């Protein structure tokens, strides 16, 4: 039910001028579902995020103390006259949640915290040796196990009172002394209580009281002392007992949980026991990661058909027979064992290959000569290429070096915990037959089903009722935003931007806040049309709680479902920044000035091609693909066609293309050292001579990187400036106009235009350079003009302005035209690329690749290119893609957008659902052929609605 709008219940924005906004005045209704749309670069994000959200955050920060503000960073006032009626604002964007390998869907949503509580309170410990559920142990049972240790063993019976806690514990030491104890065991060392024990209060410590020291003898007196000691321990620890053996090992017992057959015991169940971030619960070997980075033989020797001389050992391929010390040491191994340098490594004796990788079994003579000519001879074990890589990866302090060695390593599942991250004790606790990690490996759908059907006794129900309810609610929120195919163990760093955003959205629903302004950035990204209705309903629920939703979106269904629609335009960049239309979706559709309205009403649309591309008759066939959830599938991809890979979220599209097909081709065609997901074979690689992956990854990391430098048009522009009369008279070359080398650039900021101020524990702050006023060049360089414009003036131009300016210079105009063709005419040539969205970065890459001559054997791969694109922009992008096909090359696109899908020459639809229920090809063919498969394919069902 849409809430009734009250009088004056608006967010009133007056005079917004942030970025390209042109003094925008607008009243946005509060407690409504409001969508802001418009062409890419028209100013949507400038209004929603850079103005409204930024001001909301700034006001919140100003309400905090100066002490608190220093940890949250500064927030400048946006360029706006006033904003009235602003609520507390929360931004939910598309940034990946976390790059920390410990961060999972479960930890991000805090569901794992509730699970730890549930397993600790109502979980049942089981003996890992198959002796069934563990019952409480009596004092006599524990005493008998200790009594049966080898005769003459010297043991100390300890009462573990402090575990992983910070402090000096002076009061505790005094208390133990008063109770008559003589010794304590602290962090592996025994102290007497009459000496001064100094501990660092900021370090975590383990502390146990030495209750008795006993020599094991098979007599009643010894057994009696053990019983007395155990009873003394229990008074201090509520059941936890430790026995320190002579070799330093510790045996743990618990009066509450212990196996009466084999003596296995587990400490008191507490939430920390199930945390892979706590020393108490994490696997000792992998420290709770579930994996370790180890050298990968397939990456070290990517092509076993090559010999060592031919570069078969990838890390040595550029230093074969050189003077590098690494090669000289390796050559000592070669000479000692007479390893053939010209024999393919795949045909070499396995023992020799093992020694190359793992090192020599014996000390050998290793000869080296330094650059200065100094000779060195040593007898030692050769460490092996694999060990060399691992050691250097651990020892280096250089990020570049670490990335270099990482290229030869892979994540290997931990052998101790088998990837489960926790200790044996933690994993022995079951609920409904599952340990906590096995539960997190269930899909969201199955997890909900499991909890609804779990059988608990009355006591368990009473204790776990609230935690169970909270877990089921939060899992349901994730399901309602279309993420039922995910599992709680999924690493946050592997989530797409859309998935991460919807997880944050689900978390906010769980918080049940009211009176909040939520600002969202394209939440429909990565979502199949089938799941879109659920997402819209979820946002409606948030609105009905009494919140305002301000959503930047291009999806037609979302726009039509909005209470209020704002169209920013009329075009992009300097030609945008105005409110073209605002009102209900119907009112916007009736507004002749609104391009969005024309598309929504059907007056304007992307026309379905009358004929599909015939292709060149060649195909690429992948057999036996079974990575992640793929069900050993075979797929044939026709070449010289536009091929769309579709399917519901989590159906296996990215696994099939990005993790299997692309790495195979990059390895075989581009000769990259990458490892594909499991597959059987690939046929037709000879039809491909180049693979171009147009991803949404950032294209640069420094303020000097910009669109002009990335597409290489800046080289031509610098050459043009260097050929002006003024430049020649001064003796300037094209390097004078570069901000990457000294000479023409500003000497203070080194061509960045900004000065970076390191804030140590806070994010770095960038301030405009005072010397050049952000212009990057020194005054002398800026005096050189071409048609009245300096090099800085050119960098300030949009791509369209620059194209018009340089129209008479073919090599410059051609590159700028490509940027305009992919819908980036609004983009400033000198814009810092770190400010680009993923969609913009992807289109800049496409413009760069399109400069190269078509080979007829190039395969382009794009992943959701519609991200951030208005329907008009999609039309432009499709024109460029059609040009690629006409030039004889091939294009594969992973996409949910129906306007792109309907233009396909061939569709491969995966499903039928996401996660374990996906991974199969359920429909394939032309869009028209898919209409005959609507009973199997969700994509076909939605395609049928727009093709009729």
Curated annotation (Swiss-Prot):
The keyword tRNA processing does not apply. Residues 316-595, 615-944 form the ABC transporter domain. InterPro entries: ABC_transporter-like_ATP-bd, ABC_transporter-like_CS, ATP_grasp_subdomain_1, P-loop_NTPase, UvrA, UvrA_DNA-bd, UvrA_inter. GO terms for biological process: nucleotide-excision repair; SOS response. One of its GO terms (molecular function) is zinc ion binding. A zinc finger (C4-type) spans 259-286, 746-772. Keywords: ATP-binding, Cytoplasm, DNA damage, DNA excision, DNA repair, DNA-binding, Excision nuclease, Metal-binding, Nucleotide-binding, Repeat, SOS response, Zinc, Zinc-finger. Disulfide bonds: none annotated. GO terms for cellular component: cytoplasm; excinuclease repair complex. PROSITE patterns: ABC_TRANSPORTER_1 (PS00211), ABC_TRANSPORTER_2 (PS50893). CDD domains: ABC_UvrA_I, ABC_UvrA_II. SUPFAM superfamilies: P-loop containing nucleoside triphosphate hydrolases. Its main location: cytoplasm. ATP 2 binds at residues 647-654. It comes from the Bacteria. It is found in: Cytoplasm. ATP 1 binds at residues 38-45. Forms a heterotetramer with UvrB during the search for lesions. Belongs to the ABC transporter superfamily. UvrA family. The UvrABC repair system catalyzes the recognition and processing of DNA lesions. UvrA is an ATPase and a DNA-binding protein. A damage recognition complex composed of 2 UvrA and 2 UvrB subunits scans DNA for abnormalities. When the presence of a lesion has been verified by UvrB, the UvrA molecules dissociate. This is UvrABC system protein A. It comes from Mycoplasma pneumoniae (strain ATCC 29342 / M129 / Subtype 1). The gene is uvrA.
């Amino acid at each position: 039910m849409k809430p009734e709008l009250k009088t004056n219940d608006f967010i009133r924005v007056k005079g917004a001028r942030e970025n390209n906004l042109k003094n925008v005045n607008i009243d946005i209704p509060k407690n409504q579902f409001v969508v802001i749309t418009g062409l890419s670069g028209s100013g949507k994000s400038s209004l929603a995020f850079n103005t409204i959200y930024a001001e909301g955050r700034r006001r919140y920060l100003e309400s905090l103390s100066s002490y608190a503000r220093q940890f949250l960073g500064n927030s400048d006032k946006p360029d706006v006259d006033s904003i009235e009626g602003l609520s507390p604002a929360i931004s939910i964007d598309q940034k990946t949640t976390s790059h920390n390998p410990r961060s999972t869907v479960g930890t991000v949503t805090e569901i794992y915290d509730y699970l730890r509580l549930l397993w600790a309170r109502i979980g049942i410990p089981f003996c890992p040796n198959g002796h069934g559920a563990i019952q409480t142990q009596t004092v006599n049972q524990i005493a008998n196990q200790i009594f049966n240790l080898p005769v003459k063993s010297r043991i100390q019976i300890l009462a573990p009172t402090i575990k992983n806690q910070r402090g000096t514990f002076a009061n505790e030491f005094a208390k133990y002394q008063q109770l008559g104890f003589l010794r304590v065991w602290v962090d592996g060392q025994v102290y007497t209580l009459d000496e001064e024990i100094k501990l660092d209060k900021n370090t975590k410590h383990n502390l146990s009281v030495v209750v008795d020291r006993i020599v094991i003898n098979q007599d009643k007196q010894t057994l009696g002392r053990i019983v007395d000691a155990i009873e003394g321990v229990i008074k201090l620890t509520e059941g936890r007992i430790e026995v320190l053996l002579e070799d330093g090992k510790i045996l743990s017992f618990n009066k509450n949980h212990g196996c009466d057959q084999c003596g296995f015991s587990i400490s008191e169940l507490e939430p920390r026991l199930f945390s892979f971030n706590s020393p108490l619960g994490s696997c000792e070997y992998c420290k709770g990661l579930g994996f370790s980075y180890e050298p990968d033989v397939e990456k070290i020797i990517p092509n076993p058909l090559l010999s060592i001389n031919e570069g078969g050992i990838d890390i040595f391929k550029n230093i074969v027979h050189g003077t590098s010390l690494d090669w000289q040491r390796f050559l000592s191994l070669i000479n000692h064992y007479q390893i053939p340098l010209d024999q393919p490594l795949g045909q070499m004796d396995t023992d020799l290959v093992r020694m190359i990788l793992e090192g020599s079994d014996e000390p050998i003579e290793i000869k080296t000569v330094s650059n200065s000519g100094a000779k060195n001879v040593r007898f030692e074990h050769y460490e092996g290429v694999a060990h060399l890589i691992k050691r250097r990866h651990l020892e280096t302090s250089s990020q570049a070096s670490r990335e270099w060695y990482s290229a030869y390593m892979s994540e290997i599942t931990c052998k101790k915990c088998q990837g489960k991250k926790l200790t044996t004790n933690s994993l022995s606790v079951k609920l409904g037959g599952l340990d906590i990690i096995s539960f997190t490996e269930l899909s969201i759908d199955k997890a909900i089903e499991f909890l609804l059907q779990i059988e608990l006794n009355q006591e368990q129900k009473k204790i776990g009722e609230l935690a169970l309810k909270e877990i089921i609610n939060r899992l349901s929120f994730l399901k309602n935003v279309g993420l039922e195919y995910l599992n709680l163990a999924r690493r946050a760093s592997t989530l797409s931007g859309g998935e991460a955003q919807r997880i944050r959205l689900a978390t906010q629903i769980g918080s049940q806040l009211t009176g909040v302004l939520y600002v969202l950035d394209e939440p429909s990204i990565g979502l199949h049309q089938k799941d879109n209705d659920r997402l819209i309903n979820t946002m409606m629920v948030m609105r009905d709680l009494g919140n305002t939703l301000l959503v930047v979106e291009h999806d037609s269904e979302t726009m039509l479902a909005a209470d209020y629609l704002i169209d920013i335009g009329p075009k992009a960049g300097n030609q945008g920044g105005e409110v073209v239309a605002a009102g209900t979706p119907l009112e916007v559709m009736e507004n002749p000035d609104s391009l969005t309205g024309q598309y929504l009403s059907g007056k304007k649309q992307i026309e379905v091609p009358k004929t599909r591309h015939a292709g060149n008759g060649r195909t690429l066939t992948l057999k036996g693909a079974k990575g992640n959830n793929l069900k050993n599938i075979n797929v044939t991809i026709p070449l010289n066609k536009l091929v769309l890979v579709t399917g519901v979220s989590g159906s296996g599209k990215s696994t099939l293309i990005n993790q299997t097909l692309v790495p195979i081709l990059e390895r075989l065609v581009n000769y990259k050292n990458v490892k594909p997901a499991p597959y059987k074979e690939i046929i037709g690689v000879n039809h491909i001579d180049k693979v171009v992956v147009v991803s949404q990854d950032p294209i640069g990391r420094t303020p000097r990187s910009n669109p002009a430098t990335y597409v290489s048009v800046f080289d031509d522009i610098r050459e043009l400036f260097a050929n002006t009369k003024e430049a020649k008279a001064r003796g300037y070359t094209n390097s004078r106009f570069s901000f990457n080398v000294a000479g023409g650039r500003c000497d203070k900021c080194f061509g960045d235009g900004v000065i970076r101020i390191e804030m140590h524990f806070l994010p770095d702050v960038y301030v405009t350079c005072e010397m050049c006023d952000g212009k990057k060049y020194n005054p002398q360089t800026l005096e050189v003009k071409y048609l009245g414009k300096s090099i800085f003036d050119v960098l300030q131009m949009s791509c369209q302005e620059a194209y018009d300016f340089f129209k008479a210079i073919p090599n410059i105009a051609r590159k700028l035209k490509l940027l305009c063709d992919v819908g980036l005419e609004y983009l400033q040539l000198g814009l810092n690329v770190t400010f680009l969205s993923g969609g913009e970065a992807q289109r800049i890459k496409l413009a760069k690749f399109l400069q190269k001559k078509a080979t007829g054997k190039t395969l382009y791969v794009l992943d959701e290119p519609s991200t951030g694109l208005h329907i008009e922009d999609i039309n432009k992008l499709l024109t460029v893609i059609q040009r690629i096909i006409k030039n004889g090359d091939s294009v594969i696109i992973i996409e949910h957008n129906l306007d792109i899908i309907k233009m396909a020459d061939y569709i491969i639809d995966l499903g039928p659902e996401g996660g374990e229920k996906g991974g199969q090809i359920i429909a394939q063919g032309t869009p028209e052929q898919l209409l005959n498969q609507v009973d199997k394919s969700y994509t076909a069902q939605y395609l049928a609605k727009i093709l009729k």
